[in-house]
From Swiss-Prot:
Biological classification of the source: Bacteria, Pseudomonadati, Pseudomonadota, Betaproteobacteria, Neisseriales
Gene name linked to the record: fluC
Location within or outside the cell: Cell inner membrane
Free-text function comment from the UniProt entry: Fluoride-specific ion channel. Important for reducing fluoride concentration in the cell, thus reducing its toxicity.
Name under which the protein is recorded: Fluoride-specific ion channel FluC
Organism, as annotated: Neisseria meningitidis serogroup A / serotype 4A (strain DSM 15465 / Z2491)
Catalytic reaction list: fluoride(in) = fluoride(out)
InterPro entries: FluC
Family statement: Belongs to the fluoride channel Fluc/FEX (TC 1.A.43) family.
GO molecular function list: fluoride channel activity; metal ion binding
Length: 119
């Protein structure tokens, strides 16, 4: 059990830190939602690669469950979308939904293709 908790925890700490740093790196002139969009797109792309290339169970725990689970954020996406709706910005809310969903699906597919190619 501990042999699973350690890699999971390390990955989660690294993923949360990466998301925080990514949000800090987004220029203030962009929407606050941009950092989470980039985090979700990055996670979608990497999960495709890792799903095809990582076989060891503890590395999967570290990279997929821990790191990518903390890097990506459905709750942040949900809050941003609802906030846009509450601010009477339905077009921005719909754009946010589309960009997160379509972008993540496309990047996961691309990551799977790349992961298969390098396997």
């Amino acid at each position: 059990m501990l042999s699973n908790i350690i890699p999971l925890s390390i990955g989660a700490a690294l993923g949360a830190t990466a998301r925080w740093l990514l949000n800090l790196a987004v220029p203030a002139s962009l929407s606050p939602a941009t950092g989470n969009l980039f985090a979700n797109w990055t996670g979608a792309f990497l999960i495709g690669i890792f799903a095809e290339t990582v076989n060891h169970p503890q590395w999967k725990l570290l990279l997929i469950t821990g790191f990518l689970g903390s890097l990506t954020t459905l709750s942040g996406f949900s809050l941003e979308t609802v906030t846009l709706l509450q601010s009477n910005r339905p077009a921005s809310a719909l754009a946010n939904i589309f960009l997160h969903t379509a972008g993540s699906l496309l990047l996961t597919w691309l990551g799977l293709k790349i992961g298969t190619a390098v396997k």
